[in-house]
């Protein structure tokens, strides 16, 4: 029996991508398309979270994103 006060643990996979540095690095729609293409390339996955961040540069905010996800077989190994 599991103690109700015990924290649950699991493994989550992730990848990060950014727009190319320079003019256009602040283009959020381009970043979202890039992330969506990468998610589709993974095949069937369960998305846990998507985080968008920005870092100020001389070209404006440099956008990046991190996708946290699970593969279908991950539940069997946790």
Task: Name the predicted role of every residue range.
Residues 2-41:
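N-terminal acidic leader/helix
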Residues 34-78:
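Short, charge-rich amphipathic interface segments used for partner binding and complex assembly
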